[in-house]
Amino acid sequence: MDKFLIKMPIKPKNNETPEQKPMVKKETPKAAAKQSNKNTPIQAKEKENAQENDTPKQGRAGRSAKPAAKRKNLDTFEVNKEKNTAESENPPKRRSGRLTRSTRSMAEEGTPSPEKVKPEKLPFIKYRGAIKYFTENQDIAASADDVMQWVDKQTDVDVVPMAFDMEWPFSFQTGPGKSSVIQICVDEKCCYVYQLTNLKKLPAALVALINHPKVRLHGVNIKADFRKLQRDFPEVSADALIEKCVDLGVWCNEICETGGRWSLERLANFIAKKAMDKSKKVRMSKWHVIPLDENQLMYAAIDVYIGQVIYRDLEQREKQKLINELQFKEQNGEAAFKAVKGLGETFLSKINEVTL
């Protein structure tokens, strides 16, 4: 009930007077501030100067900046040296390049392909052989017949390798044009360039040459060339040519036990230790225009010439590899051969003995 009681003031008696406490006026902060601000003009000026020296300067956004004496000079030699040391010890992470379906390796698992390594400076290929260039149907047929007769005379071998390549114009507006040039090489001393612009149909002698049972056509990504040739000239059967052709990139992966997809230029770097002048101006030139100029003819000839050189080199490596593997098995046994093979040995060079 106490909370409902109201305390009433007690009235003093008639004879008693209430004691009055002295009134003390409390100073509020504002009043104190006003009182402290009352200075003479000289004192106010001195106070302003002192505040300018003690308070930091204001930045653009009103933020107080650090005193100039305490600011660290980021351009000094010591700071740059510390930054370089820190970056070398902990290099910044880079976003890895994302592989797309077109750039992803289509080869089987194996040692990473040396084509991904930046090639060293190599001497450019110099072709000094003959270039036989034909544009008319009857001339192309006669030349193909001569090559076929030369193939028939190679009685000491079962297979005659022939480098094969094609060229055609390309436009970013209309895409690839019709197959315009076929170049072949059966001997490193002579290359044949056949321009197909005036041909509605391939000569029968040329079709017979590329389908000769003794001829082994080879190149880089050669299967795609055969499919395009069949689209442009239906008298050619791409499937029959694909069955007996050799893709130099795939063959290199089998022999050297590398991986990945190869270009002719990178394959020339790795196998032949030569550089190719793949000028975009020549590569994207008008291959359908007659006649071809000297740069175009040399470009076409070098493509099949270096292809023939690479084939011969891989052929020798394959033979030597088989010999080394056979000798190792005879000396160390099948179990040791499998163990060493599992460690990544390619047997491209001879191994005399092994300790397991």
Swiss-Prot record:
Keywords: Exonuclease, Hydrolase, Magnesium, Metal-binding, Nuclease, Nucleus, Phosphoprotein. GO terms for molecular function: 3'-5' exonuclease activity; metal ion binding; nucleic acid binding. Its main location: nucleus. The modification Phosphoserine is found at residues 105, 113. Its EC number is 3.1.11.-. GO terms for biological process: negative regulation of mitotic recombination; nucleobase-containing compound metabolic process. Residues 13-29, 44-57, 72-92 have a biased composition (Basic and acidic residues). Pfam families: DNA_pol_A_exo1. Residues 1-117 are annotated as: Disordered. Mg(2+) 1 binds at residues 165, 167, 303. It is found in: Nucleus. One of its GO terms (cellular component) is nucleus. Residues 155-316 form the 3'-5' exonuclease domain. It is an enzyme of class 3 (hydrolase). PANTHER family: 3'-5' EXONUCLEASE, 3-5 EXONUCLEASE. Belongs to the WRNexo family. This is 3'-5' exonuclease. It comes from Drosophila pseudoobscura pseudoobscura.
